[in-house]
Amino acid sequence: MKSRQEIKKQAKQMIAEDNLWLALGLPCLVLVLVNLAFAFNESATGVSSAISGLTLLYELCASLYVFDILTKQHLVGKQLGRKISDMFGSLTAHTFKTGLLVGFITGLWFFLPYIIGIGLIVAALVSNSFGILFWLGVALLLFGGFIGLIKTYEYALAIYLAKTNEELGLFALLKESKQKMKGHKLTLFVQNLSFFWWGLGVFATGGLLGLYVTPYVLAANTIFATEVLGINDSENPRKESDLEVF
């Protein structure tokens, strides 16, 4: 298992080859700019929800594309348009359904305790009481965030397992991911936390820095997944002679 520093170094090198960072980051930047364009338009409230959904779909496709490259299932094309096309082409019906299920289940863990907690807090405030009801609501808010985060990391491998195990059922994939992530959840959390300052940079630039940071983070997380899954092909650097010319 590579160290966090080795994984991040490999991720940087990978997205630098053939300007892969541009192919991965450009769709994300377009989504950010469209979202900003409608951010102050009250009549376009549904646009933000649509952009959020498209962003999740983009991240799913980008992660699978990086995974395909790492596992030698896909060679990197020369042209930008071909790279972007290949990225969205990495999505399969099985990985899409797996991604939906993961999103639904983790969403339930996050939002059900949150909604109930908010309800209890509002009820406590209306009744002008800061007793058990109020603190139970606060506890549910904290519980929802904590357990939702754990579930997010437990199912972090599900889409990659779906890519390589088309015969496995959706819940079997989640169970397998949960099993394989034992002992690795905190490591991945710390790795993601190490991008904190990059995240601030993205915020400070209105999302523009995400053109580079988003591919960097996605590549690092996908490399981490290949390490946990024991896919050693990710250790072999791609050679210019291996690339298809389009």
Specify the residue positions occupied by each region the protein language model found.
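Membrane-interface segments at transmembrane-helix boundaries
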Residues: 1-16, 53-115, 119-132, 155-185, ...
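Hydrophobic alpha-helical transmembrane segments in multi-pass membrane proteins
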Residues: 23-59, 98-127, 135-152, 188-218
